[in-house]
Amino acid sequence: ALGVARRFAARTAIPTRVVALPRNVGGAGGFTAGIALAVEPLMQPLGPHTLGAGYRMGGYEPQPGLVHDMWLMDDDTVPLPNALEELLRASDACVAQNGRVPVALGSKAIWTDGREHLMNKPRPRTHPAEGGTKLRGLPSAYQTRSLSFVSCLLNADTIAAMRRLPKTAYFLWNDDYEYTTALLKRHIGYYVPASEVVHKTKVFGSSDADPGARFYNEVRNKIWLWRGSRGNFTRTERVLFLLKTVRRWALTWLRSPDRTVIADCLRRGWHD
């Protein structure tokens, strides 16, 4: 994969920097490193004179004007030609309608046969943040409470100001959920189905499809999220998170062809 990336960098006219990490830190570590490198040029020393017009009581709010965005994708994601264009179009629509730059925008993920990858489709936000629930001119887009890193446009200015990165220790799974729920607790984000990417997973399935031994990461990280990131959610959201997690784990257990593996993952994930 590193060789492919370097060959692409050598051939493309797009300025490209290939970064090789010294060890395997999983998807969570890779996204964290990428985000950190992207926001580094925007970082300023903390102080009363460096906060800028984007800061207000209760947090940082990105302002319309010069905007720095970063586009995150999984290594098995292939964007369709207009995927980025549609995300930027949604960003412009959000600014025009709400007077605010969206903190995060997510693409619609489809599988190799054209079916929508429902495991990457977020639910509409129950209690929308300030601004429109939907975007004028983009009727399929809607506000959401979380987004997937399969294809996600993040506002780099907000992240630099918040000094908040994903949690590398998650290694695999739920790092995007933990991070985007933190970003979107007080900020606006939209799911933009007009932006499409192909997510080339080995099998087509929902979030409760049998994950095998990787279910350990699901259990451990969800427990870590419950214990260490409860501030990401309101009280009602915490209750819903717990109920949905129990339901998902129960469906995973019922649908698994090897429940001994699932049971072992539950035991180890619970204790770790």
Where on the chain are the PLM-derived regions?
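Acidic donor-binding segment of Leloir-type glycosyltransferases
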Residues: 1-19, 41-44
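Glycine-rich, basic loop-to-helix element that forms the pyrophosphate-binding segment
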Residues: 21-62
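Active-site donor/metal-binding and catalytic loop motifs
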Residues: 192-209
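Short aromatic/hydrophobic "clamp" motif used to bind/position activated sugar donors
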Residues: 70
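Conserved donor NDP-sugar-binding/catalytic core segment of glycosyltransferases
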Residues: 80-120
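Non-catalytic, C-terminal membrane-associated alpha-helical segments of glycosyltransferases
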Residues: 213-217, 232-272
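Short, flexible, basic/aromatic active-site loop/helix in glycosyltransferases
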Residues: 123-145
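A short, conserved alpha-helix in the catalytic core of glycosyltransferases
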Residues: 147, 151-163, 169-195
